[in-house]
Amino acid sequence: MSYQQQQCKQPCQPPPVCPTPKCPEPCPPPKCPEPCPPPKCPQPCPPQQCQQKCPPVTPSPPCQPKCPPKSK
């Protein structure tokens, strides 16, 4: 048998397994800029302080003409 024939009788070798191609790393998601802080509202005006309630007006007693003391 020639050398070539003998080689042919060898069981076929499975084709070499190709290593799976290494995928490139997926791109990281784009970095979003920091969201704007909410606009700072001006301080709300403090509630207007109500004016002090006037004390109820006491009706002045009816005028009594003051009689001058009678001189004796």
Swiss-Prot record:
Region of interest called Disordered, as start-end residue ranges on this chain: 1-20, 42-72
Annotated segments matching region 3 X 9 AA tandem repeats of P-K-C-P-[EQ]-P-C-P-P: 21-47
Composition bias, Low complexity: 1-11
The keyword Signal belongs to this UniProt entry's keyword annotation: no
InterPro entries referenced in this protein's UniProt entry, alphabetically: SPRR2
Sequence repeat ranges, renumbered to this chain: 21-29, 30-38, 39-47
Biased composition (Pro residues): 56-72
Gene Ontology MF: a single term: structural constituent of skin epidermis
Pfam families (alphabetical): SPRR2
Cellular component per GO, a single term: cornified envelope
Expression induction or repression: During squamous differentiation of epidermal keratinocytes.
Similarity field: Belongs to the cornifin (SPRR) family.
Function text: Cross-linked envelope protein of keratinocytes. It is a keratinocyte protein that first appears in the cell cytosol, but ultimately becomes cross-linked to membrane proteins by transglutaminase. All that results in the formation of an insoluble envelope beneath the plasma membrane.
Name of this protein: Small proline-rich protein 2E
Provenance organism: Homo sapiens
Gene: SPRR2E
